[in-house]
Amino acid sequence: MKGNNRMKVIVVGGGAAGMMAAIAAAESGHQVELLERNEKLGKKIYITGKGRCNVTNACDLEEFFTNIVSNEKFLYSSIYQYDNQAVMDFFESNGCKLKVERGNRVFPVSDHASDVTKALADKMHDLGVKITLHCKVEDLILKEDGSVGGVVTAKGEKKIADRVVFATGGLSYEPTGSDGSGIRILEKYGHKIAETKPALVPFELKEDVGARLQGLALKNVNFSIKNGKKKVYDGFGEMLFTHFGISGPLVISASSYYVKQLYGKEVKCSIDLKPALTEEMLDKRILREFEENKNKQFKNALDKMFPSKLIPVMIELSEINPEKKINEVTKEERKRLVTLIKNWELTITGTRGFREAIITQGGVAVKGVNPSTMESKVIPGLYLAGEMLDIDALTGGFNLQLAWSTGHLAGISLE
């Protein structure tokens, strides 16, 4: 790019979306400065995927869109412009070798999230992007015509620019710098904001089973949430009991649907401990177990059916006398046990807060953003990317892909 087309661009936020936007803008020939409030870049990247960084998901795009929870249509342009394969190619060609694991989740071969940040930082360095750390942005500078003219830092410094990209994140994992300040700045200038809520987050329960079963993981179970008779979520996988309630991959995914439709409401959830068996099949299996243990007490005959930690809870909930001999357990009591195993109901009272949430649901309403360019419809010359937007997806590398895609589109669209 030559002459008058070369612009001074400021990118606010050194996370996934901001770094990708800075790279795309610099590759387009612009003079780019990236401002990051923290002492290092990519602070949140370091903790994603338990420190391994789930870079993206390698599934086909049709399946990819089914994993987006909020505003998938808004994301068509950005994802088709810069899809998961493009992201994988970027990292592979910039010194970060990747591998695909279960569920098409993509990780660095090294299992170190730091390699992801290093690839981005090295690329920015090669392209001449100026990086300014410890620099928090507190306001925008607007020109007389209402278009963006730069930013004002927390130290009162005015940084003039032709274009500004905002990629300041949501509210989750606040210690990484995601405090929602960028969203509040945009609200001040007229952007509509969808209510921000913690998502991909553990549940708190009314019952005390969490404390009693703390640390117990249940694998290959079915978990569902109902709002009256309507199922809000129904999924299969692994969950975990914690001191406050439940967590684990299955619960974390379910939370995004709960937060979207039922946030703050007390609702019933159900665990099917044996989803591969119908009630009839399960009853036959229990009969067989009972036949083999007919002279044992009920409390001593369940070790093949449940993990040892779960047995006292199941006995209590079944309301069968633990001292009772197996051959004295009635058909009605057995049916009660079958129903409990297939439909163990618990009460969700709410979610944990932003400090434990993987992402933020809500943010800058997408109606105020051009999906083909990521430019603000409210402030010309301002572009938005990443988690500060009202976009979110399930776990598995999908949310980082949204950051890469929207960041890249913002960076190539500066005009």
Regions found by a protein language model. Give the residues of each.
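Short hydrophobic core segments
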Residues: 10-12, 137, 151, 158-175, ...
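Glycine-rich FAD pyrophosphate-binding loop
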Residues: 26-50
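A glycine-rich dinucleotide-binding beta-alpha-beta segment and adjacent secondary-structure elements
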Residues: 132-134, 139, 312-392
